[in-house]
From Swiss-Prot:
This is Large ribosomal subunit protein uL3. PROSITE patterns: RIBOSOMAL_L3 (PS00474). One of the primary rRNA binding proteins, it binds directly near the 3'-end of the 23S rRNA, where it nucleates assembly of the 50S subunit. NCBIfam families: L3_bact. Signal peptide: none annotated.
Length: 223
């Protein structure tokens, strides 16, 4: 397993040399620092704790500050642990080009956009009721089960929509710009702009393929 932490910037689109338009999400992947290495002997499992994006020292309490000092690192805003990732040392700095290459497939995890309180139609795609004047309900969720005095916990009902941890699997890496710490991922990923995401090696059967060649707009203008 391999992975890295990044920040969602925006969505845009690029063209390949064959003229195909590809929608992509721009992810800023600043250098990640290895803050802790967990092993089976000491922790019972294998994992690497990564941190990215510096934050002010006065926003960190003493236990956290001591944790960062062990890795000779500045305090980090986004700290996450990636399991089954090994071969790294505390304090090591990881760049995106050290982990992934164009053409690989990844799983992206983030916190989805919060939608607030939503009804059953918007939240769970329920069908609405009859809209005639004599109808007893229009946008209600209808029956809640066969037992009158009990509603099961799994029942889909109105409530808080969004703002939940979500993972989208098997997204293709279109391009990596190491000089600007930018990664282009095909399609959309969870979360609003400037939200932090985890980019990990895919766990299902999509294998990497040859990277697509993007159209160089500057070269075409000069020609």
């Amino acid at each position: 397993m391999k992975g890295i932490l990044g920040r969602k910037v925006e969505m845009t689109q690029v063209f390949t040399n064959s003229g195909q338009l590809v929608p992509v999400t721009v992810v800023e992947v600043l250098p990640n620092t290895v803050l802790q290495v967990k092993t089976i002997d000491s922790d019972g499992y294998v994992a690497v704790q990564l941190g990215t994006t510096d934050k002010r020292v006065n926003l960190v309490n003493k236990p956290e500050l001591g944790h960062f000092k062990k890795a000779n690192s500045n305090p980090k805003r986004f700290v996450k642990e990636i399991r089954n990732m090994q071969g790294y040392e505390i304090g090591q700095v990881i760049n995106v080009s050290d982990i992934f290459v164009s053409g690989e497939y990844v799983d992206v995890t983030g916190i989805s956009k919060g939608k607030g309180f939503a009804g059953g139609i918007k939240r769970h795609n329920y069908s609405r009721g009859p809209m005639a004047h004599g109808s007893g309900y229009h946008r209600g969720i209808g029956s809640m089960g066969a037992i009158i005095n009990r509603i099961f916990k799994s029942k889909k009902m109105p409530g808080h929509m969004g703002n939940a941890k979500r993972t989208i699997q098997n997204l293709e890496i279109i391009a990596i710009d190491q000089s600007n710490n930018i990664m282009l991922i095909k399609g959309s990923i969870p979360g609003p702009k400037n939200s932090f995401v985890q980019i990990k090696q895919n766990v299902k059967g999509m294998s990497s393929k040859q990277a697509v060649e993007l159209l160089n707009r500057n070269a075409s203008v000069q020609a």
